[in-house]
């Protein structure tokens, strides 16, 4: 039955490769295009109108495959991943839809988005407590664990919210966020010890999307996809207590998020910016790095930190 899941995932991947061009045409016909942030780099202005919400297809694929795995194999993790992909994808969908409707890059307000993330994080943390109740964090490069006791639910909510924001912030260059997700999910799943036949369902749908998102991108995942990817990664890490490992397996996502925190904090306290622009990939764009160079270097860095993380499993 494990091989069955693998073969169905493979068929789904091939199906998505053929479905994405049709979906792109459908989005163009309905003028569901991306609105570029005014405060973003001028280099991105030519991307205005590129079809967005491409995350819908890979989210539905991951949701379907996750539920199938849950019902066939009784793997509780995949019920949680399926629910997380749908809930966080819904937040992103609302944001994208409102942005398109208002013909502006702003959809949900920051507070609205954060409240929904907190609410859905509570749901996921509650589900994890039902199926795999624990309060510990595995510490890399040791055999020890850190017990957070009654603080663990709060930690889980903050962690999951942070991870969904991290993946969202990284989605700013063609091929960047999707590629980093594939690398991060692969290494996190290997560290968690997931069955090899089940790992492809986490990454192949996103690889199908990447075929059409590598520069020049024919479609963007939108917040629909980027928020969902963070929900999936965060749920996986929380379920197996490997959150500390994701500092390495999700190194670029974490770095992008902290570059924004550092930038905002520095400007509020010192009235000075640390980076030319945050998230940090925009800093390198303004340094005249090409998108291809940034993506290649960021992918490579995340692969290397992922390998280091594997060495931390004792």
UniProtKB/Swiss-Prot annotation:
- According to its UniProt record, which reaction does this protein catalyse? UDP-N-acetyl-alpha-D-muramoyl-L-alanyl-gamma-D-glutamyl-meso-2,6-diaminopimeloyl-D-alanyl-D-alanine + di-trans,octa-cis-undecaprenyl phosphate = di-trans,octa-cis-undecaprenyl diphospho-N-acetyl-alpha-D-muramoyl-L-alanyl-D-glutamyl-meso-2,6-diaminopimeloyl-D-alanyl-D-alanine + UMP
Instruction: Keywords in alphabetical order, please.
Output: Cell cycle, Cell division, Cell inner membrane, Cell membrane, Cell shape, Cell wall biogenesis/degradation, Magnesium, Membrane, Metal-binding, Peptidoglycan synthesis, Transferase, Transmembrane, Transmembrane helix
> Which membrane topology term applies here?
Multi-pass membrane protein
Q: Family membership, please give it.
A: Belongs to the glycosyltransferase 4 family. MraY subfamily.
CDD domains (UniProt xref): GT_MraY
The protein's name? Phospho-N-acetylmuramoyl-pentapeptide-transferase
Q: Look up the signal peptide feature and give its range.
A: none
The record, for PROSITE patterns, names: MRAY_1 (PS01347), MRAY_2 (PS01348)
Cofactor or coenzyme needed: Mg(2+)
GO cellular component terms attached to this protein's record: plasma membrane
- Look up the EC number in the record and give it: 2.7.8.13
Gene Ontology BP, a term: cell wall organization
Which domain of life does the UniProt lineage start with?
Answer: Bacteria
Q: Could you list the residue ranges that cross the membrane?
A: 4-24, 52-72, 77-97, 111-131, 146-166, 169-189, 191-211, 219-239, 242-262, 294-314
Matches recorded under InterPro entries: Glycosyl_transferase_4, PNAcMuramoyl-5peptid_Trfase, PNAcMuramoyl-5peptid_Trfase_CS
UniProt enzyme class: transferase
Cited function = Catalyzes the initial step of the lipid cycle reactions in the biosynthesis of the cell wall peptidoglycan: transfers peptidoglycan precursor phospho-MurNAc-pentapeptide from UDP-MurNAc-pentapeptide onto the lipid carrier undecaprenyl phosphate, yielding undecaprenyl-pyrophosphoryl-MurNAc-pentapeptide, known as lipid I.
Localization terms from the record? Cell inner membrane
**Entry's Gene Ontology molecular function annotations:** metal ion binding; phospho-N-acetylmuramoyl-pentapeptide-transferase activity; UDP-N-acetylmuramoyl-L-alanyl-D-glutamyl-meso-2,6-diaminopimelyl-D-alanyl-D-alanine:undecaprenyl-phosphate transferase activity
Q: Give the pathway.
A: Cell wall biogenesis; peptidoglycan biosynthesis
Write one Pfam family the protein is assigned to: MraY_sig1
UniProt cross-references to PANTHER family, sorted A to Z:
PHOSPHO-N-ACETYLMURAMOYL-PENTAPEPTIDE-TRANSFERASE (PTHR22926), PHOSPHO-N-ACETYLMURAMOYL-PENTAPEPTIDE-TRANSFERASE HOMOLOG (PTHR22926:SF5)
């Amino acid at each position: 039955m494990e091989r069955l899941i693998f073969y169905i995932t493979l068929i789904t991947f091939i199906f998505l490769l053929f479905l994405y061009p049709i979906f792109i045409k459908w989005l163009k016909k309905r003028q569901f295009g991306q609105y570029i942030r005014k405060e973003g780099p001028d280099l991105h202005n030519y991307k205005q109108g590129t079809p967005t919400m491409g995350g819908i297809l890979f989210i539905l694929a991951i949701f379907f495959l996750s539920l199938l795995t849950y019902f066939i194999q009784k793997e509780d993790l995949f019920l949680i991943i399926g629910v997380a992909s749908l809930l966080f994808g819904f937040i992103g969908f609302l944001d994208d839809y409102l942005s398109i409707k208002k013909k502006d890059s702003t959809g949900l307000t920051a507070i609205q988005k954060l409240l929904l993330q907190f609410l859905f994080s509570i749901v996921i943390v509650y589900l994890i407590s039902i199926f795999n109740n624990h309060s510990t964090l595995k510490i890399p490069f040791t055999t020890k664990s850190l017990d957070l006791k009654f603080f663990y639910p709060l930690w889980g909510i903050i962690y999951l919210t942070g991870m969904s924001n991290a993946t969202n912030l990284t989605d700013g260059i063609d091929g960047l966020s999707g590629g980093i997700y594939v690398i991060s999910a692969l290494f996190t799943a290997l560290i968690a010890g997931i069955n090899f036949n089940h790992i492809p369902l986490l990454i192949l749908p996103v690889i199908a999307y990447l075929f059409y998102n590598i520069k020049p991108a024919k479609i963007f995942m939108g917040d629909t996809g980027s928020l969902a990817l963070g929900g999936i990664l965060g749920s996986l890490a929380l379920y197996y207590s490997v959150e500390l490992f994701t500092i390495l397996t999700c190194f670029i996502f974490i770095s992008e998020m902290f570059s924004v925190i550092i930038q905002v904090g520095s400007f509020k306290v010192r009235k000075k910016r640390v980076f030319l622009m945050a998230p940090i990939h925009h800093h390198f764009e303004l340094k005249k790095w090409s998108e291809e160079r940034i993506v290649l270097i960021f992918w490579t860095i995340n692969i290397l930190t992922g390998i280091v993380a594997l060495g931390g499993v004792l």
